[in-house]
Design a protein with these regions (language model features):
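Short, well-formed alpha-helical segments that are part of the catalytic scaffolds
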Residues: 12-25, 47
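Short, acidic, metal-binding catalytic loop of nucleotide-sugar glycosyltransferases
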Residues: 21-31, 54-56
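A conserved acidic beta->alpha catalytic loop
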Residues: 38-71
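Acidic/His-rich active-site region of diverse nucleotide-sugar glycosyltransferases
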Residues: 52-57, 84, 92-95, 127, ...
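Glycine-rich, basic loop-to-helix element that forms the pyrophosphate-binding segment
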Residues: 70-76, 85, 92-111
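Short beta-strand-to-loop acidic/aromatic patch adjacent to the donor-nucleotide binding site
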Residues: 115-127
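A short, conserved alpha-helix in the catalytic core of glycosyltransferases
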Residues: 197-216, 220-247
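Non-catalytic, C-terminal membrane-associated alpha-helical segments of glycosyltransferases
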Residues: 268, 273, 285-340
């Protein structure tokens, strides 16, 4: 069984390089092919291609349409291996489609291909342990789960859990990172399976059958909360679980500036977090939208309390956009790209 490993990049060739090197050490019992998509435009795609060449990957002749990509290239390692991503494909998105849009480009192209029995969605700023994929596949098969997540640890504190998945908290209107700061060597708590609403979007596995059942990721979020919605859909339709032996080290926020500190976060991450919380609730729990709107607005003032007026403004703008029902790419941050 071969897995399609999908990585969405945005002008981060060095992150992708380190991720590929970690993947090169993967367990040979879980073969996979790597499918990259560059959301950052032609210059970023050229930098990605240059990085692949510098890593010793050899371009292979490719015949056929590039659609739905603007450009498409195929590479292979000098020595074909059953694991470590012997086949590497790199596609240029026609525009910046966001996280789900990038994932879905490859899912649409790969879904008809019977070679792939599952899909591993992985962030570029991650370093998976050698057995991370094997553990995901094993857990999916053991329990008949359609979607399985990894446990994440940070690069700075690998001995502590960053998250073992997400749980939506309707009263405070935000997701909880499950078992955050718990020692990584400790097993998950007995209640985690019931509390789990979604995996971390940085590393999770989806079976071919699950994709047929729940469909692709919802692209209207652009960034943030699309993984939470997909997880809830999987939980209801085909089963959701954590693979506790699948460990992935994660930088977090490398592309969007999603630092955990309110003052350090980028305006983009703050804006989308507040906009998309309302969008998520409108789609999944519409009856709770009035309460969510009040809570999210009230919490914007926390940015003023920590001396971050710029992020307070971004939060209020995001909240207002969410209240108006705005979705997709926020042109106030990306409008200059469309003009190129």
């Amino acid at each position: 069984m071969t897995t399609a490993l999908i990585i969405v990049a945005y002008r981060a060739p060095e992150d992708v390089r380190q991720c590929l090197r970690a993947l090169g050490q993967s367990d040979s019992g879980a073969p996979f092919d790597i499918f990259l998509v560059e959301n950052g435009g032609p210059d970023a795609y050229a930098a990605l291609i240059a990085m692949l060449a510098a890593e010793g990957l050899i371009p292979k002749n490719f015949r056929g349409p590039a659609a739905p990509f603007h450009r498409l290239a195929r590479y292979a390692r000098e020595t074909e291996r059953p694991a470590g991503g012997a086949r590497v494909w790199a596609g240029l998105a026609p525009e910046n489609l966001g996280y789900a849009g990038g994932v879905n480009l490859w899912l649409r192209r790969l879904a008809p291909n019977p070679r792939y029995e599952g899909y591993w969605i992985l962030n570029p700023d991650t370093l998976p342990e050698p057995d991370a994929l094997a553990a995901l596949i094993e857990e999916a098969a053991r329990g008949g789960f359609g979607m399985v997540g990894s446990q994440l640890v940070s690069l700075a504190r690998p001995e502590r859990i960053a998250t073992r998945g997400q749980r939506w908290r309707p009263l405070v209107c935000r997701p909880l990172a499950l078992e955050r700061a718990k020692p990584a060597r400790e097993r998950p708590g007995a209640r985690l399976a019931a509390r789990l609403d979604a995996p971390s979007g940085a590393s999770f596995y989806l079976t071919r059958m699950a994709l047929q059942q729940i469909g692709p990721m919802e692209e209207s979020y652009f960034l943030y909360y699309e993984d939470l919605e997909w997880g809830l859909r999987a939980k209801a339709a085909c089963g959701l679980a954590l693979a506790e032996k699948s460990t992935v080290r994660h930088v977090g926020g490398a592309t969007t500036g999603a630092s955990p500190g309110r003052r350090a976060r980028s305006a983009l991450s703050v804006y989308l977090d507040h906009r998309n919380r309302l969008h998520f609730v409108r789609r999944m729990f519409p009856g709770r939208l009035p309460w969510t709107a009040l809570v999210v607005l009230a919490r914007t003032f926390e940015f003023l309390a920590v001396g971050a007026p710029g992020n307070f403004k971004a939060a209020v703008l995001g909240w207002a956009a969410g209240l108006r029902g705005e979705t997709g790419r926020p042109e106030r941050f990306y409008g200059h790209e469309a003009a190129r």
